[in-house]
Amino acid sequence: MAKEDVIEIEGKVVETMPNAMFTVELENGHQILATVSGKIRKNYIRILVGDRVTVEMSPYDLTRGRITYRFK
């Protein structure tokens, strides 16, 4: 997937699930299933319920995403 094809949107973590999966509520009110990107996992950045995050989504599957940034 080319970098130009991704959709970046901000959201809030609503629920923590097993295997580093999270339910994220986007700014537009939709809820998606998101996983943690490799760099966040490698640097041991903790993501908790209530955190604001940036999510990358593919235009082909708008129900799943990848968390790429956690706001302080």
From Swiss-Prot:
CDD domains referenced in this protein's UniProt entry, alphabetically: S1_IF1
NCBIfam families according to UniProt: infA (TIGR00008)
Subcellular location, record wording: Cytoplasm
Pfam families (alphabetical): eIF-1a (PF01176)
Lineage of the species this protein comes from: Bacteria, Bacillati, Bacillota, Bacilli, Lactobacillales
Keyword flag Cell membrane: no
Source species, domain of life: Bacteria
Main location: cytoplasm
Organism: Streptococcus pyogenes serotype M1
Name this protein carries in UniProt: Translation initiation factor IF-1
Keyword field contains rRNA-binding: yes
Keyword terms of this UniProt record: Cytoplasm, Initiation factor, Protein biosynthesis, RNA-binding, rRNA-binding
Molecular-function GO terms, alphabetical: ribosome binding; rRNA binding; translation initiation factor activity
Family to which the UniProt record says this protein belongs: Belongs to the IF-1 family.
Record function comment: One of the essential components for the initiation of protein synthesis. Stabilizes the binding of IF-2 and IF-3 on the 30S subunit to which N-formylmethionyl-tRNA(fMet) subsequently binds. Helps modulate mRNA selection, yielding the 30S pre-initiation complex (PIC). Upon addition of the 50S ribosomal subunit IF-1, IF-2 and IF-3 are released leaving the mature 70S translation initiation complex.
Subunit structure: Component of the 30S ribosomal translation pre-initiation complex which assembles on the 30S ribosome in the order IF-2 and IF-3, IF-1 and N-formylmethionyl-tRNA(fMet); mRNA recruitment can occur at any time during PIC assembly.
Any one cellular-component term (Gene Ontology): cytosol
